[in-house]
Amino acid sequence: MSGVTAIEIPQWIQDNQEDFVPPVCNKCMFSDQLKVFYVGGPNQRKDFHLEEGEEFFFQRKGDMVLKVIEKGQVRDLVIKQGEMFMLPARVEHSPQRFSNSIGLVVERERKNTEFDCVRFLVGSSNITLFERWFYLTDVVKDLPPLIKEFYGSNEFKTGKPGKGTFACNAPYEARWTDLPVPINRKEFIYDHISEVKNGPVRIYGAPEYKTEVMLLGEGSYDLESGTVELLIWLQENTFAVVEESGFTYAMKSETMVRIKPNTKCLLNVKGGFAITIRMPA
């Protein structure tokens, strides 16, 4: 069985257009080790989410606002159309999306020792009104019951913290850190055209992140996924060929390629650029 799966992004979005508007607003492209999905709008969330993994954002169409709690203060982080952003682990965040927008989100599966938190605050403060810790397996199935519990709680009715605010001790604290600014994808490529001719260029990676996001230019690359999945995201005006286990796959621009764990392949970028993403735990 091949370790390569390729999906043409524009056609996939067109085929699933009905899922990018309320009440669904999102559609999962891949859902194994890497959770790769696109999100539409409008969707104005009231809750903040906390997790132990990192999240990669890219706004394909329109802008979004990622509400975050940065060093104890709530603020709006705007991710504009065409921008990328890597959210560090353990940072409280609340995505706010608008009509006629669509964005890519990539996150990893959780280890069985990792917990997520859904948290509601008192007004615009950073005071916790209601929170629940849980093990996330499916965001579509796991979050709605917790949100329903909040809207049926005394804390929601009174707007004040109470006996039901906390159900357990927090497994970990939110991270106290300065957040980076989003990166304009096309500007980054343009600024590194000369450098990428000599080999892959890091966009995100160590020591700041466990996730590795790399820019690849024209050329041949021996790639290995290792113990996790590897994404190859072909950019506009790009043509590439992937060879794996005796199979050859010719792929055009704006294709998302997933390489399964423990798989080796040869990527030949004939023209244009590719971005690779790996998210180890």
From Swiss-Prot:
Any one GO molecular-function label of the UniProt entry: 3-hydroxyanthranilate 3,4-dioxygenase activity
Cofactor: Fe(2+)
InterPro entries according to UniProt: 3hydroanth_dOase, 3hydroanth_dOase_met, RmlC-like_jellyroll, RmlC_Cupin_sf
Binding-site residues for Fe cation, renumbered to this chain: 49, 55, 93
EC number: 1.13.11.6
Pathway: Cofactor biosynthesis; NAD(+) biosynthesis; quinolinate from L-kynurenine: step 3/3
Domain A (catalytic): annotated span: 1-162
Residues holding substrate: 55, 97, 107
Cellular compartment(s): Cytoplasm
GO biological process: 'de novo' NAD biosynthetic process from L-tryptophan; anthranilate metabolic process; L-tryptophan catabolic process; quinolinate biosynthetic process; quinolinate metabolic process
Region of interest called Linker, as start-end residue ranges on this chain: 163-179
Keyword annotations of the record: Cytoplasm, Dioxygenase, Iron, Metal-binding, Oxidoreductase, Pyridine nucleotide biosynthesis
GO cellular component: cytoplasm
Top-level taxon in the UniProt lineage: Eukaryota
Region (Domain B): 180-281
Residues that hold O2 according to the record: 45
Annotated catalysed reactions: 3-hydroxyanthranilate + O2 = (2Z,4Z)-2-amino-3-carboxymuconate 6-semialdehyde
Primary role: Catalyzes the oxidative ring opening of 3-hydroxyanthranilate to 2-amino-3-carboxymuconate semialdehyde, which spontaneously cyclizes to quinolinate.
Alphabetized HAMAP family for the sequence: 3_HAO
PANTHER family recorded: 3-HYDROXYANTHRANILATE 3,4-DIOXYGENASE (PTHR15497:SF1)
Membership in a protein family: Belongs to the 3-HAO family.
Name of the molecule in the record: 3-hydroxyanthranilate 3,4-dioxygenase
Organism whose genome encodes this protein: Caenorhabditis elegans
